UniProtKB/Swiss-Prot annotation:
Species of the source: Macaca fascicularis
InterPro entries referenced in this protein's UniProt entry, alphabetically: Archaemetzincin (IPR052009), MetalloPept_cat_dom_sf (IPR024079), Pept_M54_archaemetzincn (IPR012962)
Co-factor binding comment: Binds 2 Zn(2+) ions per subunit. One is catalytic, whereas the other seems to have a structural role.
Recorded name of the encoding gene: AMZ2
The protein's name in its UniProt record: Archaemetzincin-2
Gene Ontology process terms (BP): proteolysis
Length: 360
């Protein structure tokens, strides 16, 4: 195992900058917010720790990238920021996300509520779910895993056409595996920062995906034409467990973070670290390090205290926490299902520690 440990001065500069304008901006932050963010360069901090690499296949080792400090983020000419008339994040479900209509709709509401808390201050809106056939995307059966896959690039084109006028971004979510091109095995997600669109799959987050008993294998792809989507009528969907919900929330917020202009984090253990495989993704925390937190706060303009309180409320709320957020047709049928948040309890304790620092 390798530990990436930066010096106090390096972390301080990455967070605050040496640019007098950005230093002044930092000094105008709430005293509690400065106190929390200063934990970034406190060696004894129990809130923010160094990045640990466990194998040569981990992201930082296999995908060398230049780090992005706050000043580089702030000065990025290609970075998009929400404006008063484009301040909504739209979520588009593609295909069913649960084994019943109620489970699918509740799961979407849980994800929506989480995004509302994570990107506190932005509007998060649901679009009516669409079947795979509506996207007109290419698809295949993966030769190695024998599971169905849809073409990520085709989905991005579909989402770009559907993007509402008031959207900062539109993100597609699906339980069907993705591939970006014929030569690739799979991809967890793909986004276009310039177009403000992204597509993310949670298919590989089920507990059985990598097991011999995985039920999503398709023996042979039978289609009469490229427009025959009947194979998706009963595709396999894993059970929505607490771990799958946690993994989904991580991926969704990580990828939307990229649309805000946050690059992969190389400073401290952080949600914005890259991940090359599921084990590495599971190691990533749900939280942003102070450097990435300052970036997101700069882009969105939230109070850190209120954001953390909203996240605690989402964990504590047994139902969706997003009243009125579901499409009209979904209000028929039985009520809310219990939200499986067991996997989030440790993170809740961490947030409460942060709130104690913020509210001293």
């Amino acid at each position: 195992m390798q530990i990436i440990r930066h010096s106090e001065q390096t972390l301080k500069t990455a967070l605050i900058s040496k640019n007098p304008v950005l230093v002044s901006q930092y000094e105008k932050l709430d005293a509690g917010e400065q106190r929390l963010m200063n934990e970034a360069f406190q060696p004894a901090s129990d809130l923010f720790g160094p990045i640990t690499l466990h194998s040569p296949s981990d992201w930082i080792t296999s995908h060398p990238e230049a780090p992005q400090d706050f000043e580089q983020f702030f000065s990025d000419p290609y970075r998009k920021t929400p404006s008063p008339d484009k301040r909504s994040v739209y979520i588009q479900a593609i295909g069913s996300l649960g084994n019943t209509r109620i489970i699918s709709e509740e799961y979407i509401k849980w994800l929506t509520g989480y995004c509302k808390a994570y990107f506190y201050g932005l509007r998060v809106k649901l679009l009516e779910p669409v079947p795979v056939s509506a996207t007109r995307c290419s698809f295949r059966v993966n030769e190695n895993t024998q599971n169905l896959q849809i073409h990520a690039g085709d989905i991005l084109k579909f989402l770009k056409k559907k993007k509402p006028e008031d959207a900062f971004c539109i993100v597609g979510i699906t339980m069907i595996d993705l591939y970006p091109r014929d030569s690739w095995n799979f991809v967890f997600g793909q986004a276009s920062l310039t177009d403000g669109v992204g597509i993310f799959s949670f298919a590989r987050y089920g507990s059985d995906f990598y097991s011999m008993r995985y039920e999503g294998k398709v023996k042979k792809l039978k289609k009469t034409s490229s427009s025959d989507y009947s194979i998706f009528n009963n595709y396999y969907i894993p059970e929505i467990t607490s771990v799958l919900l946690l993994r989904s929330c991580k991926t969704l917020t990580h990828e939307i973070g990229h649309i805000f202009g946050l690059r992969h984090c190389q400073w401290l253990a952080c949600l914005m670290q890259g991940s090359n495989h599921l084990e590495e993704s599971d190691r990533r925390p749900l939280n942003l390090c102070p450097i990435c937190l300052r970036k997101l706060q700069c882009a969105v303009g939230f109070s850190i205290v209120e954001r953390y309180k909203a996240l605690v409320r989402w964990i504590d709320d047994e139902s969706s926490g997003t009243p009125g957020a579901t499409p009209e047709h979904s209000r028929e049928g039985n009520g809310n299902l219990p939200k499986p948040v067991e996997a989030f309890k440790e993170w809740k304790e961490w947030i409460i520690k942060c709130l104690a620092v913020l509210q001293k």
